[in-house]
């Protein structure tokens, strides 16, 4: 078994992005800017945003985090997004999810200019990805895709099994692999004999948040296995158990 070193690959990618940002600055005398809207004080969201800000600064982007209490009115958020859409200094907008219950996630996502939609959640970007057109792609499936391509550049004809059908991970992951001419099967909680599906796969991406879901005897030799997310168990932090 070969362990995929995601941290190493991510570091290499950040170096590539750093050069791209430097080239953009030299050519246009302008640095792309990322603005993140963070609502509330949920610890996981704060960690995610802090890591995003750190990575943005590392590659040379301008980074701005706008924080609101979880009591903020929905209109305040929508008005701020409206202003950011019109701000030429802002290249990308990201609203950290989840949102407080009184704020309509759909309204917030649809308010973001599709060309500045970093998460790729806007219906226009979702539709473009499904249609094979250029679009913003959700970051997590895009990261998984880049890891897979690093391990196997030629995915033509590979059989891929996606465990999970969420709009955030499963569905966009399937679209990315379909564009590479993979034969893609999306599985979920109602799938019969998940083990049999996995045993036929050249690529398995688990995106359901269940620790140790994919067992060692579910995976054939040389299969690429990616687990989306980290789960906390009695044994500590856990990835897929293989």
Ranges and model annotations:
Residues 1-28:
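Positively charged, low-complexity intrinsically disordered leader regions
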Residues 34, 56-70, 184-185:
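Short beta-strand elements in bilobed, periplasmic/extracellular small-molecule ligand-binding domains
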Residues 40, 64-74, 189-190:
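Short beta->alpha junction loops
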Residues 44-53, 138-214, 218, 224:
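Glycine-rich phosphate/diphosphate-binding loop of Rossmann-like nucleotide-binding domains
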Residues 76-88:
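Short, well-structured alpha-helical segments in soluble
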Residues 89-99, 104-107, 201-234:
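Glycine-rich phosphate-binding loop
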Residues 95-156, 173:
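Anion-binding alpha/beta catalytic cores of soluble intermediary-metabolism enzymes, centered on
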Residues 240-242:
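Conserved small/polar residues in nucleotide/adenosyl-binding loops
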